[in-house]
């Protein structure tokens, strides 16, 4: 394909990139949760600790507090210690999970910004699409920015329009 043919399909390229980025933005929470679950295998240890605590609580319910106070108190301290250990473990895992999700979100937005900047750079002086100038008469200079082509739609305006249209189309799925 020649450069002029590539420029002719620029509107579709930009629209597809904007659609893909918005779709990924909607799927980002699910994607980051999946990735963090894959990276963290501590949930098994937590469930094992919960099972141990549950077992000790059942054992505690069978012990008579009046007759076997020392055993009852020892078991209760053990349950409290294990519960505190579990809480600490869960807090650490939750903090790590938040860091992973934050990193994935930041990486996505940096990639999206780089993609949009590269599209603006490539199509800065070329109109993404050309329509009859009377269709956009009152706003033709604003819509054509930065190309200055009569009836042309500039990349910045096209990206804004695509973002709005795609956001409206994908709103029911978010």
From Swiss-Prot:
<feature type="topological domain" description="Lumenal">
    <location>
        <begin position="1"/>
        <end position="8"/>
    </location>
</feature>
<keyword id="KW-0175">Coiled coil</keyword>
<dbReference type="GO" id="GO:0050821">
    <property type="term" value="P:protein stabilization"/>
</dbReference>
<feature type="topological domain" description="Cytoplasmic">
    <location>
        <begin position="30"/>
        <end position="99"/>
    </location>
</feature>
<feature type="coiled-coil region">
    <location>
        <begin position="39"/>
        <end position="94"/>
    </location>
</feature>
<dbReference type="GO" id="GO:0045048">
    <property type="term" value="P:protein insertion into ER membrane"/>
</dbReference>
<feature type="transmembrane region" description="Helical">
    <location>
        <begin position="100"/>
        <end position="120"/>
    </location>
</feature>
<dbReference type="GO" id="GO:0006620">
    <property type="term" value="P:post-translational protein targeting to endoplasmic reticulum membrane"/>
</dbReference>
<dbReference type="GO" id="GO:0043529">
    <property type="term" value="C:GET complex"/>
</dbReference>
<dbReference type="InterPro" id="IPR028945">
    <property type="entry name" value="Get1"/>
</dbReference>
<protein>
    <recommendedName>
        <fullName>Guided entry of tail-anchored proteins factor 1</fullName>
    </recommendedName>
</protein>
<comment type="function">
    <text>Required for the post-translational delivery of tail-anchored (TA) proteins to the endoplasmic reticulum. Together with CAMLG/GET2, acts as a membrane receptor for soluble GET3/TRC40, which recognizes and selectively binds the transmembrane domain of TA proteins in the cytosol. Required to ensure correct topology and ER insertion of CAMLG.</text>
</comment>
<feature type="transmembrane region" description="Helical">
    <location>
        <begin position="9"/>
        <end position="29"/>
    </location>
</feature>
<dbReference type="GO" id="GO:0005789">
    <property type="term" value="C:endoplasmic reticulum membrane"/>
</dbReference>
<keyword id="KW-0472">Membrane</keyword>
<feature type="transmembrane region" description="Helical">
    <location>
        <begin position="149"/>
        <end position="169"/>
    </location>
</feature>
<feature type="topological domain" description="Cytoplasmic">
    <location>
        <begin position="170"/>
        <end position="174"/>
    </location>
</feature>
<dbReference type="GO" id="GO:0001964">
    <property type="term" value="P:startle response"/>
</dbReference>
<dbReference type="GO" id="GO:0071599">
    <property type="term" value="P:otic vesicle development"/>
</dbReference>
<dbReference type="GO" id="GO:0071816">
    <property type="term" value="P:tail-anchored membrane protein insertion into ER membrane"/>
</dbReference>
<dbReference type="Pfam" id="PF04420">
    <property type="entry name" value="CHD5"/>
</dbReference>
<feature type="topological domain" description="Lumenal">
    <location>
        <begin position="121"/>
        <end position="148"/>
    </location>
</feature>
<keyword id="KW-0812">Transmembrane</keyword>
<comment type="subunit">
    <text>Component of the Golgi to ER traffic (GET) complex, which is composed of GET1, CAMLG/GET2 and GET3. Within the complex, GET1 and CAMLG form a heterotetramer which is stabilized by phosphatidylinositol binding and which binds to the GET3 homodimer. Interacts with CAMLG/GET2 (via C-terminus). GET3 shows a higher affinity for CAMLG than for GET1.</text>
</comment>
<feature type="region of interest" description="Interaction with GET3/TRC40">
    <location>
        <begin position="39"/>
        <end position="97"/>
    </location>
</feature>
<keyword id="KW-1133">Transmembrane helix</keyword>
<dbReference type="GO" id="GO:0050808">
    <property type="term" value="P:synapse organization"/>
</dbReference>
<keyword id="KW-0256">Endoplasmic reticulum</keyword>
<dbReference type="InterPro" id="IPR029012">
    <property type="entry name" value="Helix_hairpin_bin_sf"/>
</dbReference>
<comment type="similarity">
    <text>Belongs to the WRB/GET1 family.</text>
</comment>
<dbReference type="GO" id="GO:0051649">
    <property type="term" value="P:establishment of localization in cell"/>
</dbReference>
<dbReference type="GO" id="GO:0005783">
    <property type="term" value="C:endoplasmic reticulum"/>
</dbReference>
<dbReference type="GO" id="GO:0007605">
    <property type="term" value="P:sensory perception of sound"/>
</dbReference>
